[in-house]
Amino acid sequence: MKSAYAQSGVDYTLLEPFKQQMIAAGKRTLSFPNRRGVYINEEVLHAHGGVFEYHGTLPHLWCNTQEGLGNKNWIAEWMYQHDGTGRTHYASIAKDTALMAVNDVIAQGALPVVYTDEVAVGDSAWFGDERRAADLAQGFYEICEEVGMALPAGESPALRYLIKPEPPVTAAPSLSGCVTGIIAPRERLITGSNLAPGDHIIAAASSGLHANGISLVIKKALELKDSFLTMLPTGRTLGEEALIPTRSYVALVETLLAHEVAVHALLPGTGDGVGKLAYDKRPFTYRIHSWLSVPPLFTYFREAIGLPLQDCLKTFNWGAGYYLFVPESEAERVCALGREAGYELMDVGVVAEGERCVVFEPEGVTLPPPGH
């Protein structure tokens, strides 16, 4: 018979196997930050905290960032319930979750070394799906290996009175995490204060939707006859396109730092779409003269669903997952180094003095700054 606490939504018999999967995955990551001179204390036998130290000799700084995934795993849950494939999609969801914080921390020139996660559910029953739990743990392991960070600790609360997903999804956790990055030597710190008129804007291609604009995608998909099972011209369903994992830009930034490129600012292409380019509060105009290929999901939303272009550009990354602001003299070298590191980069525009906005010349549209 279940305990009174289990009947109230917190069942440790379901939670414990999940925790052990995550702890086991985390232990396999502890050596990953060694390549950056950071070492995890492996004598800590629980997941209540991660203890780490820097063994290098360079003067250094630490950078800490916390970010949540948002609603993207709601789509994963819908697909798991309805697409008939048995795929949970949670390996890629784990990567999305971690990269929300990781792609932010590198904007300061910090390289990720430690990550802690939170998987908050509405009911402990969610933890009882062994396949989904295994996929999530494996996804966290894989992204830690890719970017060079450890997962020494985490949190997995059951919050029945706080977390209740919208139907038809019956259960979905709130996913988030905190990353610590190291800036070594400390002179590699990038604050954005060097951004200036004349700088070139280099855009790095996204893999697709990433994790912004999800609420709009869900709303519009549920209005379609086949919802997330709607077939797109790519041969994949709308749900499959939406769940393509976020791209990591760690290797790109690490390459530029290693080659001592004069980067004036770095910017993740996340909230506010292309309009986020005008994040700096100074009176700069961001003139975009060229653009990357637009992912098919965005084209579908514009052409088949009829979403106005202004909404598209202010909601989605529109094909650019990261921006680099560099002096004109560095633009060509940045694109070449990025290609060598495996990224598609394009010199898409220039920073100019003027009204704070984004002039998107390929479509003849002017976008206001974030929050407007």
PLM regions and their residue ranges:
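Gly-rich Lys/Arg/Thr-decorated short loops/hinges at beta-loop-alpha junctions or inter-strand turns
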Residues: 2, 72-84, 229-237, 282
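Conserved helix-loop functional segments at active or binding sites
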Residues: 28, 71, 104-107, 121, ...
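N-terminal amphipathic/basic leader segments beginning at the initiator methionine
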Residues: 1-35, 39
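Short, acidic (Asp/Glu-rich) active-site segment that either coordinates a divalent metal cofactor
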Residues: 186-234, 238
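Active-site pocket-shaping loop/turn-to-helix segments
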Residues: 87-95, 236-248
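Buried hydrophobic packing segments
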Residues: 51, 101-102, 217-220, 252-256, ...
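Glycine-/charge-enriched secondary-structure boundary and capping motifs
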Residues: 2-10, 14, 129-150, 156-173, ...
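Glycine-rich phosphate/pyrophosphate-binding loop regions near the starts of catalytic domains
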Residues: 34-207, 367-371
